[in-house]
């Protein structure tokens, strides 16, 4: 790659070449113009790891903790380090552009992609995202802020019209992007799928051009979300530079015709192409060649950072009687559905095939010096656990054979085209390719051998984007080939799981065959669904066992145990792109299991893994509770580090945890109704609502305990004289002394809140405006400084003037952290002023 003289290159490009540069060629690559030595660029998801170019059977990758986990760290320096490692992973995958971070706002706990964003508050989200992007771009990799903007639900996400006031848009939903851009002008921005007040974002000139480009002075590349372009000239004229993925639906000959008919002027097309060429120049120093090979890193130092991030994200919610940390020398009973399952990431574009994963049970076992025992307690899968890892090939290797044909099994003379050995019986074939498979229509037989460890009735399940039949020793057990029912798997492209059962004997080996037909063989009605590739399959199995039997056994064992830890929560089955959750509850049986184990042993520790809030009807019973999110590769080790005190918990909640779903401010206005969703809570999202109506959540935003204690003292404020025009350069500097008053080294998060004076508009009781994290040894004191621009600390969006308003009056400053201690001060705004820009 070479640096381009952008203006000279624009003059040399033909109309056809310009048009080609404004759309991708496939799922992950931009167009090349060999005549002018313009190469193709590669991009990759994304939110918590760099998958590379393949969903199916691709190169493994590092999996970082999910974004709500990283949000819980409140650690801007850590996020910078995470960004740098993400960049190195990107380079190893030959990718110039990372499709992340996601910084939408979780207006409801039910949002399917809520785990992908950092926080419900724009200041926390924006400052973390800005540092993450700096880490990426300091290494030369292009960051992509997404999804711009109000992409806050999965229900009808391509079509839903988000009806939102401009005040809420500015103060809540644009704020993470606003603050991230102040720290790091990212190379790319990705538009949201949805409409805003009647117009799809990808063709919304007010959002893309007026606010992002003109008001904020940003000059990067705007790309669509995948299949989120809905027009030709409208999108080009609004400022959408790049349609993704390819092949194009809306550019190509349609765009050439639009230019020739002056629906889109060529100088406007030149603006779009100019941004594409500027992106080439931004990533050129990376030296990544076209179609670079994809490699794995998995270095010891990377594993250490992932472990640190996982541990630093764990929130200590309760710790009565100092139940934690656990004693390594004592025996321990581990209970629960998440104990031996590494819930390391959410689903959808955030999912990837990790280098390795550490389940919580394995993390505990590695730490404990005493006996470690296990009880299932309850199963919490949404679909039956994947069977692939329990299968063996005919040669005795782990997994199963995947054999591909162009004809169905009814053709005895069909030719075998491809044969792979797979271990995961969850396969998304979006990017499967073979020279002799020339269309989306093909067939595959999956064959492996299963030897159960226990007698019993086993349930088998098959989910397909396509058709599927599962046979045991030649007997048809599951038929998912006709009368299919629409499900949510594979981005909404697949069926529900169809099940069958068979009695099996322990120690006997059974031949398992799944006959699969790709997506064109399905009879599902796919209207209104974005079809991703030629198909997908998932087959699983489990021995049938009653929940009562499992719960009773767990409770009995708990009553006799020295130490007990319960691991429960959600997985990527429950929290995933493509659909929202129906409720906040844990999977069926989990709450009863936790409650009964706590009755049997009140000192049992509860660890919840979820990307977003869940209900906890047993919370009053538990003395010790951790919120552990989806912790990436090292989730099990990170949790164990905190449980045993090798890491002192320092995380704070980035989301409010309501007592029940009905308490959430979006409860009456979540999901699309007749094609629209009303953001009826306006600016009162998350803690802003709970504090305004004086409704206590189960655990508030910013909550988190420690194994040590801290004091905060000596708050002082420094301001500068006001200027006639409000702009950057009027900092408010708060300094506070923080002391570790306990016996354990630890970290404190100092939070700075602003309380506005009474004005002519309703405003939140207080708003977070700054924070800092400080690490202290026992007895150590440090001075912490938090600097906030006065315009950002005081302003609200005035819809009449269409400007930010900083009103005259006395503003209170509150400084909080671990514990109930609040330091107070104030400052004056001498005159009301209005402003625009970053």
Curated annotation (Swiss-Prot):
Top EC class for this record: hydrolase
Catalytic activity, EC: 3.2.1.21
Domain spans labelled PA14: 395-555
Catalytic activity: Hydrolysis of terminal, non-reducing beta-D-glucosyl residues with release of beta-D-glucose
A cellular component annotation (GO) from this entry: extracellular region
Keyword check for Glycoprotein: yes
Pathway entry: Glycan metabolism; cellulose degradation
Location relative to the cell: Secreted
Principal subcellular localization: secreted
One annotated GO molecular function: beta-glucosidase activity
Signal peptide: none
Active site annotation, chain numbering: 225
Residues glycosylated per entry: 57, 197, 493
Pfam families attached to this UniProt entry: Fn3-like, Glyco_hydro_3, Glyco_hydro_3_C, PA14
InterPro entries: Cellulose_deg_GH3 (IPR050288), Fn3-like (IPR026891), Glyco_hydro_3_AS (IPR019800), Glyco_hydro_3_C (IPR002772), Glyco_hydro_3_C_sf (IPR036881), Glyco_hydro_3_N (IPR001764), Glyco_hydro_3_N_sf (IPR036962), Glycoside_hydrolase_SF (IPR017853)
GO terms, biological process: cellulose catabolic process
Alphabetical UniProt keywords: Carbohydrate metabolism, Cellulose degradation, Glycoprotein, Glycosidase, Hydrolase, Polysaccharide degradation, Secreted
PANTHER family: BETA-GLUCOSIDASE (PTHR42715), BETA-GLUCOSIDASE-RELATED (PTHR42715:SF27)
Family listed: Belongs to the glycosyl hydrolase 3 family.
Function, as annotated: Beta-glucosidases are one of a number of cellulolytic enzymes involved in the degradation of cellulosic biomass. Catalyzes the last step releasing glucose from the inhibitory cellobiose.
Name this polypeptide is given: Probable beta-glucosidase I
Taxonomic lineage of the native organism: Eukaryota, Fungi, Dikarya, Ascomycota, Pezizomycotina
């Amino acid at each position: 790659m070479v640096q381009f003289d952008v203006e000279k290159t624009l003059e040399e490009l033909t109309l056809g070449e310009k048009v080609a540069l404004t759309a991708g060629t496939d799922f992950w690559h931009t167009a090349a113009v060999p005549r002018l030595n313009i190469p193709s660029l590669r991009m990759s998801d994304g939110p918590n790891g760099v998958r590379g170019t393949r969903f199916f059977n691709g190169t493994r990758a590092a999996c970082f903790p999910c974004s709500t986990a990283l949000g819980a760290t409140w650690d801007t320096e850590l996020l910078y380090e995470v960004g740098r490692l993400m960049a190195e992973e990107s380079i190893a995958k030959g990718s110039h552009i990372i499709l992340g971070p996601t910084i939408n706002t979780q207006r409801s706990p039910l949002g399917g992609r809520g785990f992908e964003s950092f926080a419900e508050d724009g200041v926390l989200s924006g400052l973390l995202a800005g540092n993450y992007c700096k880490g990426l771009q300091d290494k030369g990799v292009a960051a992509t802020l997404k999804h711009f903007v109000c992409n806050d639900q999965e229900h009808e996400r391509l079509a839903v019209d988000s009806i939102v006031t401009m005040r809420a848009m500015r103060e809540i939903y644009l704020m993470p992007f606003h603050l991230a851009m102040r720290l790091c002008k990212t190379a790319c921005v990705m538009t949201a799928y949805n409409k805003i007040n009647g117009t799809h974002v990808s063709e919304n000139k007010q959002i893309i051009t007026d606010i992002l480009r003109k008001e904020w002075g940003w000059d990067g590349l705007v790309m669509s979300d995948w299949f989120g372009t809905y027009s030709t000239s409208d999108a080009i004229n609004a400022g959408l530079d790049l349609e993704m993925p390819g092949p194009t639906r809306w550019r190509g000959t349609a765009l050439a015709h639009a230019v020739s008919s002056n629906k889109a002027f060529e100088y406007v097309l030149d603006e779009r192409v100019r941004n594409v060429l500027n992106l080439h120049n931004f990533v050129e120093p990376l030296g990544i060649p076209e179609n670079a090979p994809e490699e794995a890193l998995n270095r010891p130092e990377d594993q250490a950072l992932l472990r640190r991030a996982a541990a630093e994200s764990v929130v200590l919610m309760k710790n009565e009687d100092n139940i934690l940390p656990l004693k390594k020398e004592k025996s321990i009973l581990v209970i629960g559905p998440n104990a031996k399952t590494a819930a390391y990431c959410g689903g959808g574009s955030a999912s990837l095939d990790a280098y390795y994963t550490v389940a919580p049970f394995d993390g505990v076992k590695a730490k404990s010096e005493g006996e470690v025992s296990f009880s299932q307690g309850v199963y919490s899968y949404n679909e039956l656990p994947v069977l692939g890892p329990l299968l063996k090939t005919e040669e005795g290797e782990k997994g199963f054979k995947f054999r591909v044909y162009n004809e169905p099994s009814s053709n005895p003379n069909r030719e075998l085209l491809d044969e792979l050995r797979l271990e995961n019986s969850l396969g998304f074939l979006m990017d499967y390719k073979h020279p002799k498979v020339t269309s989306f229509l093909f067939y595959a037989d999956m064959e492996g051998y299963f030897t159960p460890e226990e007698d019993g009735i086993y349930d088998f399940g098959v989910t397909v984007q396509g058709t599927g039949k599962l046979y045991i020793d030649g007997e048809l057990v599951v038929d998912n080939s006709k009368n299919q029912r629409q499900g949510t798997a594979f981005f909404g492209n697949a069926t529900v799981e169809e099940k069958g059962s068979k009695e099996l004997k322990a120690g006997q080996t059974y031949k398992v065959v799944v006959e699969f037909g790709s997506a064109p063989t399905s009879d599902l009605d796919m209207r209104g669904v974005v079809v991703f590739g030629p198909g997908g399959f998932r087959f699983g199995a489990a021995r049938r066992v009653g929940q009562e039997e499992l719960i009773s056994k767990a409770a009995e064992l708990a009553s006799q145990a020295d130490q007990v830890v319960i691991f429960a929560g959600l997985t990527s089955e429950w929290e995933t792109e493509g659909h929202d959750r129906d409720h906040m509850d844990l999977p069926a049986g989990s709450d009863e299991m936790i409650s009964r184990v706590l009755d049997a042993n009140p000192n049992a520790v509860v660890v919840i893994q979820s990307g977003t809030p869940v209900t906890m009807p047993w919370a009053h019973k538990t003395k010790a509770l951790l919120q552990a999110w989806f912790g990436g590769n090292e989730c099990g080790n990170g949790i164990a580090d905190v449980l045993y005190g090798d890491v002192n918990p320092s995380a704070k909640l980035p989301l409010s945890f309501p007592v029940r779903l009905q308490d959430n401010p979006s409860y009456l206005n979540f999901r699309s109704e007749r094609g629209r969703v009303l953001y009826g809570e306006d600016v009162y999202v998350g803690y802003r609502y709970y504090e305004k109506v004086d409704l206590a959540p189960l655990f508030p935003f910013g909550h988190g305990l420690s194994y040590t204690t801290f004091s905060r003292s000596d708050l002082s404020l420094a301001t500068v004289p006001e200027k006639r025009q409000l702009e950057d350069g009027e900092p408010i500097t708060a300094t506070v002394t923080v002391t570790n008053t306990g016996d354990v080294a630890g970290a404190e998060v100092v939070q700075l809140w602003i309380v506005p004076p009474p004005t002519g508009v309703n405003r939140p009781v207080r708003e977070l405006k700054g924070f800092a994290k400080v690490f202290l040894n026992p007895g150590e004191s440090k001075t912490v400084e938090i600097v906030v621009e006065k315009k950002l600390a005081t302003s609200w969006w005035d819809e009449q003037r269409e400007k930010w308003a900083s009103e005259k009056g006395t503003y209170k400053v509150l400084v909080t952290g671990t514990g109930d201690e609040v330091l107070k001060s104030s400052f004056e705004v001498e005159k009301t002023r209005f402003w625009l820009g970053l």
